[in-house]
Amino acid sequence: CLHNWKPEWEIWNDFGLSRAAASRVDALKSTHPIECPVNHPDEAAEMFDVISYEKGCSVLYQIHEFIGGETFRRGIAAYLKKHSYGNTETHDLWDALEEACQKAAAESGKAEPEPVRLIMDKWVFTPGHPVLEVSGDKCAITFKQRPFKFLSTDDKTLWPIPVCLKARVKGKGLVEKRFLMQEAQLTMDVAKELSGDGELECLVVNAGGSGFYRVTYDKHFTSLITKDVNGNLSTIERFNLVNDAWACVRAGILSAADYLNLIQVF
């Protein structure tokens, strides 16, 4: 509502700082799920922190951007109407949003509606978040996910990641693609999925900056992005690029030298 009323305030750029704060806490071993069982009133008070608020808001914004604002609003309206003057549980909201996705898919002829409950149950009831490692060349892109932690871990948790891509293709301009990644590794054919006969000039993962996950690129895709940082990335995408890179240095995924090379282009 605030963004639609005052878009010049760029509220989601400002929220990027809050999301980054939640990501830092969520990368600790001491993190907790957004929703936890409460057996005593004192335990409820303990839940009011950056995870329940900022991460909670982040995953809602993530699904909002993935399914689309209009579909999200339809789901919220149906949820409020169905449960007015009543009590609800968490899954009631996800079911309402999923029904809205099913209706939107039927109207548009889309084969598969977004499985909102599957996505949100994982993000709400599982502590932590993933890092998406992007590598490849002009022909193929490989995405790998794993839990993001500042300290090494044997955790093999997989998330259903709502991935939003933005690609700049020679002769075609900007091409956008959204997909749900549930596998540990996924390889995408560039020509088939993005560029066609055109040359891939730049690739941005987590386009729009709404995803609650880290992204790190190999040297090939980093070089494409940094050829024109201001032209290729929005404000929040530039912030996420630097913030994710520094977090990956702290986690031992990226070297300090690579980070310094990155920030020199700004």
Language model region names:
Residues 1-152:
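Hydrophobic alpha-helical and helix-loop surface patches within well-folded domains
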Residues 209-211, 252:
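Peripheral, non-catalytic segments that deliver or gate enzyme domains
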Residues 38, 42, 89, 183, ...:
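Solvent-exposed, flexible loop/coil residues
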